């Protein structure tokens, strides 16, 4: 069976009917090996693998899943990672969610790009506000230091995202721009996003982030957009609380 763009143009998969094995190429692959017990389970590294390698090609993956639905499959053998031979519906269900760009979990990614540490403090404070409002899953990622592949993974995992970034050279601090371009290239869509910008004389981070987000499909950018001048002050907290209310209830 031909499976173009999962994730190479010439990809094909093979179904061995006597043993009911699907040799799935890059489909159902993950980082890791059979003899390694991943404490976070199969999904964590499989999700990171999918969105950073196959993620742009959701439609071809959906087409492959439709072909696979008509086959009797007992074992899946991907090119990368362990052989799958139990609870196949779980793996197939996750691939269906991922390739249709639906959120896997309810939760919030707070991704920040901080130059001197002030935007980082605001992002951490905002995460505390979300937890206080009952949001159980809040992932806080530092775009200057954390693995970009893991930040992209969490962006696709959760249904909401908040971006906090410093203004830089009339735009946004480059690691935030890099992150947004990663999402753009992976067809990020169907999410709710809030924005926190930091600047001194003329903040530009917010409109820059918003402009990139507006090129993506079905992204809801919520208000208010929070503007911090250099460092978070007591007077900034009401706007942050208002945004946290909107995100927590989205």
Specify the residue positions occupied by each region the protein language model found:
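Catalytic core of the metallo-beta-lactamase
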Residues: 1-38
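Conserved beta-strand elements of the Class I
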Residues: 15, 22, 107-111, 194
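Cofactor-binding loop segments of dinucleotide-utilizing enzymes, especially the Rossmann-like FAD-
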Residues: 26, 112-115, 143, 197-198
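Glycine-rich beta-alpha junction loops
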Residues: 27-29, 80-83, 115
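FMN-binding flavodoxin-like domain, especially the glycine-rich phosphate-binding loop
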Residues: 34-76, 80-83, 125-143, 151-250
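Short N-terminal or domain-adjacent regulatory/targeting segments
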Residues: 77-104
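Short, charged N-terminal beta->alpha structural module
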Residues: 111-133
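Active-site loop segments of alpha/beta catalytic cores
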Residues: 147
């Amino acid at each position: 069976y031909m499976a173009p763009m999962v994730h190479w143009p010439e990809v094909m998969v093979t179904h061995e009917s006597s043993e009911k094995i699907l040799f799935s190429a890059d489909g159902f692959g993950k980082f890791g090996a059979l003899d390694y017990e991943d404490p976070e389970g199969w999904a964590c590294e499989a999700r990171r693998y999918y969105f950073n390698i196959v993620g742009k090609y959701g439609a071809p993956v959906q087409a492959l899943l439709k072909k696979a639905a008509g086959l009797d499959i007992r074992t899946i053998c991907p090119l990368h990672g362990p052989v799958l031979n139990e609870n196949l519906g779980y793996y197939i269900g996750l691939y269906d969610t991922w390739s249709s760009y639906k959120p896997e979990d309810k939760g919030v990614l707070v991704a920040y790009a901080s130059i001197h540490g002030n935007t980082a403090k605001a992002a951490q404070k905002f995460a505390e506000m979300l937890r206080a409002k009952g949001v159980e899953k809040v992932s806080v990622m530092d775009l200057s230091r954390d693995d970009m592949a893991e930040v992209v993974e969490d962006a696709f995992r959760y249904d909401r995202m908040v971006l906090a970034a410093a203004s830089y050279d009339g735009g946004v601090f480059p690691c935030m721009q890099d992150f947004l371009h990663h999402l753009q290239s992976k067809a990020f869509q169907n999410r709710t996003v809030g924005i926190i910008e930091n600047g001194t004389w003329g903040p530009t981070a917010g409109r820059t982030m918003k402009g990139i987000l507006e090129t993506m499909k079905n992204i809801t950018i919520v208000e208010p957009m929070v503007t911090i001048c250099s460092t978070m002050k007591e007077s900034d907290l009401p706007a942050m609380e208002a945004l946290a209310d909107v995100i927590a209830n989205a």
